[in-house]
């Protein structure tokens, strides 16, 4: 058998050499890429690269549109990619020190596009918080799974399903359960320690629904709570349930303390008409009802030919004489007009006989009012102290029937004998630069400034308004009082504010 000349098989050897050179060049390029990637990894060992497959899909339509070409590119180049992946595996066996095979050209290009779209290449910014991508352990587990085996193209096909699932969840449809996702991820070699967006979304939905339920509380519960708070809070600023006060007996109502937790709202009108009404006007007290009607309670007028200011108070607006049957009490001041005492219709102890002293018909002292000038001088607000009898265990007024000057309310207060008495004071007003006046918060019940406006409080509870009085028109005033005052006490205190005070004007 004769051998062929060399010229017959030389061309075949040339083709073989060219094919081997091409393969060698391709291997050299891939080896260079692998060494470059390893060098980059050694330079940045702590950097965790963004993973386009493991990163949670945002439910925005813009990101879904950006992810759509990724699926098409992978599907269109699946054949060549599979071939290059096999070559990468063979190259990984040649390089024993490699920890991660080089990504194929098409896959690398597509992953680079996805990474640039997820990090700094696009103007789109990721939200801080739980949508930061996968956590550290999940990403490291993916790197380990890719180093142990070939790159799985199925993870790209998964993105289309994940995108559809994300759009369904955003549209309010049924979301895939966390167990199915865990099974799929474990089947693909992804760590199960990854946090699921579905579970977090359920937590968000539950928290938002609970917040919505707390914001949209039933009106009945809110109203019940506000009613209880209004009943417990003594301040008239708190909303109170509308209560119609029934007045059967005027004299009994005028002497009965106000119910606890209820503010008695009244109105005082001043009548200056007539020959001497300018000097001695008549004052009428009416009860303001919730239905807008007014109920007459008391009337008072300053007596003529009296050494000191002396106001008679009656339950009959047409009979203001001391000897009448409607006479219920009086208000009397000292010579300077700074100290006032409120009495009922009892007998004066100085004019009473021995039998009268023992019969218990002596007059009671219901209140004492003391006015003083403020530290700012005569132009400042007046300082006001109110002394009333104390209350017993059954919320009844303690009877104080003094037989001499040493047993009066003013004497007890001046001697610091606070047994069986309650000391009240006016609330200090605040200077307002806008109105250039001293103001108090009357919660809409007083509309005009006046030196006669005041609020009575207790020193231990400044938020509890025992009584307030103020002007709303030329001859119209509002008067609101609370426990432990009665209508006669409050009306007499208001009358003391009308009277002129030589030492305080």
From Swiss-Prot:
Similarity-based family: Belongs to the TUB family.
Subcellular location as annotated: Cytoplasm; Nucleus; Secreted; Cell membrane
Keyword terms: Cell membrane, Cytoplasm, Membrane, Nucleus, Obesity, Phagocytosis, Secreted, Sensory transduction
GO biological process entries: intraciliary transport; phagocytosis, recognition; photoreceptor cell maintenance; positive regulation of phagocytosis; protein localization to cilium; protein localization to photoreceptor outer segment; receptor localization to non-motile cilium; regulation of G protein-coupled receptor signaling pathway
Location of the region described as Disordered in the Swiss-Prot/TrEMBL record: 35-243
Task of the protein: Functions in signal transduction from heterotrimeric G protein-coupled receptors. Binds to membranes containing phosphatidylinositol 4,5-bisphosphate. Can bind DNA (in vitro). May contribute to the regulation of transcription in the nucleus. Could be involved in the hypothalamic regulation of body weight. Contribute to stimulation of phagocytosis of apoptotic retinal pigment epithelium (RPE) cells and macrophages.
Originating gene: Tub
Compositionally skewed regions (Acidic residues) per UniProt: 196-205
GO molecular function: G protein-coupled receptor binding; intraciliary transport particle A binding; protein-containing complex binding
The name this protein goes by in its record: Tubby protein homolog
Subunit structure: Interacts with GNAQ. Interacts with TULP1.
């Amino acid at each position: 058998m004769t051998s062929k000349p060399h010229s017959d098989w030389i061309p075949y050897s040339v083709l073989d050499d060219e094919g081997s050179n091409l393969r060698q060049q391709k291997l050299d390029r891939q080896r260079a890429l692998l060494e470059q990637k390893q060098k980059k990894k050694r330079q940045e060992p702590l950097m965790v690269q963004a993973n386009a497959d493991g990163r949670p899909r945002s439910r925005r339509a813009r990101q879904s549109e950006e992810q759509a070409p990724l699926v098409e590119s992978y599907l269109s180049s699946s054949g060549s990619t599979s071939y290059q992946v096999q070559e990468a595996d063979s190259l990984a066996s040649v390089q024993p020190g490699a920890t991660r095979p080089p990504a194929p050209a098409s896959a690398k290009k597509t992953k680079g596009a996805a990474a640039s779209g997820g990090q700094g290449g696009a103007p789109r910014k990721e939200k801080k918080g739980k949508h930061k991508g996968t956590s550290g352990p999940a990403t490291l587990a993916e790197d380990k799974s890719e180093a142990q085996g070939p790159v799985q193209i199925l993870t790209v096909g998964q993105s289309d399903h994940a995108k559809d699932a994300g759009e369904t969840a955003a549209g309010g449809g049924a979301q895939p359960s966390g167990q199915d996702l865990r099974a799929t991820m474990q089947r693909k070699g992804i760590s199960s320690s990854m946090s699921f967006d579905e579970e977090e979304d359920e937590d968000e939905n539950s928290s938002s629904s609970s917040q919505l339920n707390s914001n949209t509380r039933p009106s009945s519960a809110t109203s019940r709570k506000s009613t209880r708070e209004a009943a417990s809070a003594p301040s008239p600023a708190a909303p109170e349930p509308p209560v119609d006060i029934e007045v059967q007996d005027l004299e009994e109502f005028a002497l009965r303390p106000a119910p606890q937790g209820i503010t008695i709202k009244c109105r005082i009108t001043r009548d200056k008409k007539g020959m001497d009404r300018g000097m001695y006007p008549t004052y009428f007290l009416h009860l303001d009802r919730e239905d807008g009607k007014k109920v007459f309670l008391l009337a008072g007028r300053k007596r003529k030919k009296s050494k000191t200011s002396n106001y008679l108070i009656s339950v009959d607006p047409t009979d203001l004489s001391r000897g009448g049957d409607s006479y219920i009490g009086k208000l009397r001041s000292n010579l300077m007009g700074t100290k006032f005492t409120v009495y009922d219709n009892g007998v004066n102890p100085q004019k009473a006989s021995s039998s009268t002293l023992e019969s218990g018909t002596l007059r009671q002292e219901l209140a004492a009012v003391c006015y003083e000038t403020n530290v700012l001088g005569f132009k400042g607000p007046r300082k006001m102290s109110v002394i009333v009898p104390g209350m017993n265990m059954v919320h009844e007024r303690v009877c104080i029937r003094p037989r001499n000057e040493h047993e009066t309310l003013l004497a007890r207060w001046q001697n610091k004998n606070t047994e069986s008495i309650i000391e009240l004071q006016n609330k200090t007003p605040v200077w307002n630069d806008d109105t250039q006046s001293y103001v108090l918060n009357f919660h809409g019940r007083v509309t005009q400034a006046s030196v006669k406006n005041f609020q009575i409080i207790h020193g231990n509870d400044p938020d509890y308004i025992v009584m307030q009085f103020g002007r709303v028109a030329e001859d119209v005033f509002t008067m609101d009082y609370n426990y432990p005052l009665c209508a006669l006490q409050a009306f007499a205190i208001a009358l003391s504010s009308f009277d002129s005070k030589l030492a305080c004007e």
